[in-house]
Amino acid sequence: MYEGIVQELIDELGRLPGIGPKSAQRIAFHILQTETFDVSRLAEVLTVVRDKVRFCAICGNVSEKETCGICRDPRRSPATICVVEEAKDVVAIERTREFRGLYHVLGGAISPIDGIGPDDLRIRQLMQRLADATVTEVIIATDPNLEGEATATYLSRLLSTFDIRVTRLASGLPVGGDLEYADEVTLGRAFEGRRLVGE
């Protein structure tokens, strides 16, 4: 334990996701000990981000405008919507340069343990978007964990009432991974999702 404001800094940094007590302490001391670290600039950027960044009115992605750049892009296909849990998932998919449709960010996943149900997610907004007959396919790209699977199952049932194609991202072995380290579920999915060689 440190005194006063130093401990407050460590505590506040530790509240960030993925930052444990040791990492928070390391970051705090980096800020304190590095002369070149511009604390004022960091504080300014944090304040500006909080004031300027919002969620896209259409898809829920982060944006500095009412709608995000992807939703405004006329080159994107409005026929396909990829449903993801968080805005960071949009960034991950965009890095592949494989998807040219639009997104819908749920804002999380169904997790009864955490008290998150379907009404806590942006599912109603997704249904409103599907009322427009332009959409022909919904790709469910939730995480391949219990919460993501629960969300995907819930969405699949809900979307079965629409005359659209509903697909789920394939999951299986990562490129460069070793079979011996793969868990049973991952291996099972890899077998289920196998395809003919040459496809």
UniProtKB/Swiss-Prot annotation:
Q: Output the Gene3D superfamilies linked to this UniProt entry.
A: 3.30.60.80, 3.40.1360.10, 6.10.250.240, RecR Domain 1
Q: Which UniProt keywords apply?
A: DNA damage, DNA recombination, DNA repair, Metal-binding, Zinc, Zinc-finger
Q: Which GO terms describe its biological process?
A: DNA recombination; DNA repair
The UniProt record lists the keyword Mitochondrion: no
Tell me the superkingdom of the source. Answer: Bacteria
C4-type zinc finger locations on the chain: 56-71
Q: Which GO terms describe its molecular function?
A: DNA binding; zinc ion binding
CDD domains assigned: TOPRIM_recR (cd01025)
Task: Tell me which residues make up the Toprim domain.
Answer: 79-174
Instruction: Report the function annotation for this chain.
Output: May play a role in DNA repair. It seems to be involved in an RecBC-independent recombinational process of DNA repair. It may act with RecF and RecO.
Family from the record: Belongs to the RecR family.
Protein name per its UniProtKB record: Recombination protein RecR
Which lineage do the record's taxonomy fields give for this organism?
A: Bacteria, Bacillati, Actinomycetota, Actinomycetes, Micrococcales
